[in-house]
């Protein structure tokens, strides 16, 4: 049995409905739904307030789907109750970000500013001009958008300029050493 898949998913304060392979979860932070693979069976145990995922057999693919389905449901419950948040910081002279409507504009050393449309279900806030906070109930969407923002200008290894996750450690490489007297002598 899958070690992750066999654990029930505690619902807590979320409202859950299961019908025909579609799981809908609603909470204070929003609503999410997941179409479950036809081989997986999801049951709502309303007495214990938990979701239980079962699989038909011990086939390799079903074992993998078992743990995956349970993890996705757990992330959905956590997201609609508490939400997810990723923070990024911009480092570099003149590097900054700005939000206009549903667009995040990054000025990070290119000739033109980079405009990224903010997906629905994701809230983006700024702290100053160099800190970006991405939040929302969908863990995959929050992580993907934060990754897209970072991908615009990854931290470079010599000075560390670029967009990085808050607290991310960037290894700085040493530059070229001064040649000294070796190059000019004959």
How would you describe each model-predicted region?
Residues 2-66, 70-147, 151-186:
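N-terminal intrinsically disordered, cationic/polar leader segments
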């Amino acid at each position: 049995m899958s070690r992750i898949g066999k654990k029930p998913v505690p619902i807590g304060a979320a409202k859950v409905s299961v019908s025909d392979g579609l799981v809908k979860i609603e909470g204070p932070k929003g609503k999410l739904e997941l179409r479950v693979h036809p081989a997986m069976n999801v049951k709502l145990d309303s007495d214990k307030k938990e979701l239980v995922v079962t699989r038909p057999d011990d086939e390799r693919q079903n074992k993998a789907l078992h743990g995956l389905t349970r993890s996705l449901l757990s992330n959905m419950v956590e997201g609609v109750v508490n939400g997810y948040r990723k923070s990024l910081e911009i480092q570099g002279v003149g590097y900054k970000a700005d939000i206009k409507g549903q667009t995040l504009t990054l000025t990070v050393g290119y000739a033109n500013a980079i405009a990224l449309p903010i997906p629905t279900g994701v809230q983006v806030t700024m702290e100053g001009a160099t800190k970006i906070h991405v939040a929302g109930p969908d863990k995959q969407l929050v992580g993907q958008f934060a990754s897209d923002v970072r991908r615009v200008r990854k931290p470079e290894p010599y000075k560390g300029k670029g967009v990085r996750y808050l607290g991310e450690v960037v290894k700085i490489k040493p530059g070229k050493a001064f040649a000294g007297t070796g190059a000019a002598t004959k």
